[in-house]
């Protein structure tokens, strides 16, 4: 059927109006239950200088190469994605140890470059990030390839900005950073800290003016203060909370996600133990995201998943030859594992809301099983080699402190064997006798972060140093029994040696979190170091 000229003009006019309307706003995602998120947000908080985990158990949590591999693999199944970080990122502590400044800066460089590889979009700093000074922070910020956001800071901020607006699938997302980098109520030198709430409210107006309808806040501040602020400032669909400051190697437990009004609040465990994934599904024009995860059940699922991981590890340990676990206890753990699996199935992810936009949340533990990003892995190897080559020379003259009068020096197992042959033979069958080898194969034997747990008498009078380890490599007799020079001279004087070290020594000296899993048990590990002539 042909259209009259008048009808044709009406149709053309209608099409023109429709096209104009489409140009004025982002295309809406069709109604229904989409399987592909409009935007996938990868979240890392309080990475705090953790390049990879350090310990003596398999498949530990952490590793920037594993996190990068995970992000790369999951990015492919989303329409668009962002990587965001908040809290201390580059350094483990608020201050650098003078002797470790070079290797700590090189580690920060490796972290910054790896974040760039992961396509970091924005990050907000914690106190630790000023550890090397504002100039180094500015240099490392450039290495990440992403802006540093801190709307409430001025002065020596390392080049921080207030907001960033990005576009994803036709939607503008506005990101603001708020940092409260205070340690003992003091900010880093030259940094002025303005009111966080006022800055967050002002940033929202700035984001609105820029056309952002999805608003994300990166907060680096104490969680309690962050939660109180979120309760009083509306308009942000996603808030990512990182710590204000972090110290040392201790790993935090996961913090469950929560809703404050219509705002999803997310915080991942420190040291890159996990990466949170927040999927935003946009349907229609409503940018209020409903809970598509069932957060109450999500918390229970996460608890169950951690329990399942613990049981898998315990069962694997118990199934090894020579295990001291009784068969009935092993069977009980297997039954527990099946029960936990059933509970996980019963607490599965619910169906999405029937209409409107919604989010889904998950926390992915970062483990070896995720694989390793090749480029990041090579960078890590380069970092370790650089440190090894540097420290071998820089600390070549570092010798152990002299032994005070009336005290014992370390002799080494080669001297102990002359009287304790049976014990020495058994020791050679244990992992303790091979502790130094992995450092050599991985070029970490001169790394100040590593060597202390792999040698005997480290940094003790008459013991070893990072470069002076002759005769004292590996975990030898004197780690547990104490230095033995006076014992060798007077073997009948039982007061000169610790004959039966307490089990607590294992945990206090070496086997403590995060170097072992939280389920590590000295009672189960103890039998592995007992044998002929050695308590067995």
Where are the predicted features?
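Bacterial N-terminal signal peptides that target proteins for export
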Residues: 1-11
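Bacterial N-terminal signal peptides
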Residues: 11-21
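Generic structural microfeature
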Residues: 18, 62, 118-119, 143, ...
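Acidic, metal/ion-coordinating pockets
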Residues: 23-383
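Short sequence/structural segments immediately N-terminal
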Residues: 30-38, 47, 148, 297-314, ...
């Amino acid at each position: 059927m042909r259209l009259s000229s008048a009808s044709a003009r009406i149709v053309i006019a209608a099409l023109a109006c429709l096209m104009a309307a489409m140009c004025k706003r982002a295309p809406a995602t069709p109604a229904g239950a989409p399987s592909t998120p409009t935007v996938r947000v990868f979240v890392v908080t309080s990475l705090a200088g953790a390049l990879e985990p350090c310990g003596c158990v398999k498949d530990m949590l952490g590793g920037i190469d594993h996190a990068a591999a995970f992000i790369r693999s999951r990015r492919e199944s989303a329409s668009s994605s962002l990587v965001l970080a908040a809290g201390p990122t580059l350094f483990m502590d608020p201050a650098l140890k003078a002797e470790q400044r070079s290797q700590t800066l090189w580690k920060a460089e490796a972290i910054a470059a790896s974040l760039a590889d992961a396509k970091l979009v924005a990050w907000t700093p914690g106190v630790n990030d000023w550890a090397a000074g504002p100039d180094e922070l500015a240099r490392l910020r450039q290495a990440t390839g992403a802006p540093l956001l801190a709307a409430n800071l001025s002065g020596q901020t390392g080049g921080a900005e207030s907001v960033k607006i990005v576009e994803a699938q036709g939607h503008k997302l506005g990101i603001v950073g708020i940092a409260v980098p205070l340690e003992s109520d003091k900010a880093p030198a030259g940094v002025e800290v303005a009111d966080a709430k006022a800055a967050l409210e002002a940033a929202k107006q700035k984001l609105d003016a820029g056309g952002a309808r999805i608003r994300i806040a990166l907060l680096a501040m104490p969680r309690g203060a962050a939660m109180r602020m979120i309760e009083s400032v509306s308009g942000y669909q996603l808030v990512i909370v990182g710590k204000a400051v972090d110290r040392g190697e201790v790993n935090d437990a996961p913090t469950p996600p929560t809703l404050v009004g219509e705002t999803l609040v997310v915080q991942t465990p420190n040291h890159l133990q996990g990466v949170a994934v927040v999927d935003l599904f946009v349907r229609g024009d409503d940018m209020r995201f409903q809970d598509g995860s069932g957060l109450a059940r999500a918390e229970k699922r996460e608890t169950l998943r951690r329990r399942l991981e613990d049981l898998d590890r315990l069962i694997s340990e118990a199934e090894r030859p020579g295990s001291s676990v009784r068969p009935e206890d092993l069977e009980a753990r297997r039954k527990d594992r099946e029960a936990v699996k059933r509970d996980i199935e019963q607490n599965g992810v619910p169906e999405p809301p029937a209409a409107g936009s919604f989010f889904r949340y998950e926390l992915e533990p970062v483990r070896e099983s995720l694989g390793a990003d090749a480029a990041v892995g090579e960078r890590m190897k380069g970092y370790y080699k650089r440190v090894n080559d540097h420290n071998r020379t820089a600390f070549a003259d570092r010798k152990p402190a002299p032994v005070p009068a009336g005290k014992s020096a370390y002799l080494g197992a080669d001297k102990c064997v002359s009287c304790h042959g049976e014990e020495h033979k058994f020791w050679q069958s244990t992992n303790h006798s091979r502790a130094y080898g992995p450092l050599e194969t991985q070029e970490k034997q001169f790394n100040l972060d590593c060597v202390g747990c792999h040698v005997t008498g480290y940094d003790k009078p008459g013991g070893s140093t990072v470069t002076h380890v002759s005769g004292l490599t590996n975990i030898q007799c004197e780690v547990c029994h104490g230095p033995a020079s006076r014992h060798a001279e007077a073997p009948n004087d039982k007061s000169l040696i610790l004959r039966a070290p307490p089990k607590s020594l294992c945990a206090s000296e070496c086997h403590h979190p995060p170097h072992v899993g939280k389920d590590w048990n000295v009672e189960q590990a103890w039998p592995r170091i007992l044998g002929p002539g050695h308590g067995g």
